[in-house]
UniProtKB/Swiss-Prot annotation:
Active-site residues (renumbered): 27 (schiff-base intermediate with substrate), 85 (proton acceptor)
NCBIfam families: PRK02227.1-1, PRK02227.1-3
Keywords for the protein's UniProt record, in alphabetical order: Lyase, Schiff base
Lyase in keyword set: yes
Organism: Methanococcus maripaludis (strain DSM 14266 / JCM 13030 / NBRC 101832 / S2 / LL)
Pathway: Cofactor biosynthesis; methanofuran biosynthesis
Family from the record: Belongs to the MfnB family.
Catalysed reaction, written as an equation: 2 D-glyceraldehyde 3-phosphate = 4-(hydroxymethyl)-2-furancarboxaldehyde phosphate + phosphate + 2 H2O
Protein's name in the database: (5-formylfuran-3-yl)methyl phosphate synthase
């Protein structure tokens, strides 16, 4: 299982790189779970990241505005991101989510056929009125995405496992694999929960808080020693 770590600036990105993260995922925590950072931060992070190491960019907890979201996705793509992560926050149904992701996929793949598109739903979708997390694999498949992902929308200390049990998460992983895609799971994941994600076949685990001082995604800073500990658990 590979590790995605989400820095908010280049200094944190260096810590994640030195700690051994596999994917450097640029985000902006004050703007939400999948808060979008600025194009120049993505560009600077890409320049700071070793060649061959992939850079991801979250483009926001997005509304149901396909044109707006598509432009954001293209902005992240041309800024140097290899993975484009879309948080399907304002989409209320399969059809709305599909509408957003089909257009994002078209824009991203037209700009770079090797770019990777991630459709991200929320395990706690019921708290914010977002699309059912269990339809995300179908949305991703039908939109031509590469990865189906789950995160949590509300960052209040509850983790992925507070909203979906292991059986439901296993169902999500297995359906995603059945459709020939990779599966990514995140959501205030604690280091001791990572072995359970490995057990159900998760391909990519995403963290920020667990790699930050005081375990605080907002006030804390990513530290390479914390990243190293998480990498070790992912590799064991």
């Amino acid at each position: 299982m590979i590790l995605l770590v989400s820095p908010k600036d280049v200094a944190e990105a260096y810590e994640a790189i030195e700690g051994g993260a596999d994917i450097i995922d640029v985000k902006n925590p004050p703007e939400g779970s999948l808060g979008a950072n600025f194009p120049w931060v993505i560009k600077e992070t890409r320049e700071a990241t070793p060649e061959g190491m992939l850079v991801s960019a979250a483009i926001g907890d997005v509304p149901y505005k396909p044109g707006t979201v598509t432009l954001a996705a293209l902005g992240a793509t041309v800024s140097g991101a290899d993975y484009i992560k879309v948080g399907l926050y304002g989409t209320r149904s399969y059809q709305e989510a599909l509408d957003v992701m089909k257009n994002v996929t078209k824009a991203v793949k037209d700009a770079g056929e090797n770019k990777i598109v991630v459709a991200a739903g929320y395990a706690d979708a019921y708290r914010v009125g977002a699309v059912d997390p269990l339809v995300i694999p179908k949305v991703a498949r039908d939109a031509g995405c590469d990865v189906a992902m789950l995160d949590t929308a509300v960052k209040d200390g509850k983790t992925l496992f507070d909203h979906m049990d292991l059986d439901l998460l296993r169902e999500f992983v297995e359906e995603t694999h059945k459709y020939g895609m990779k599966c990514a799971l995140a959501g205030s994941i604690k280091i001791e929960e990572i072995p359970m994600l490995k057990e159900i076949g998760c391909d990519i685990v995403g963290v920020r808080g667990a790699a930050c001082t005081q375990g605080d995604r907002n006030a804390g800073r990513i530290q390479k020693d914390l990243v190293k500990e998480i990498v070790k658990v992912c590799r064991d």
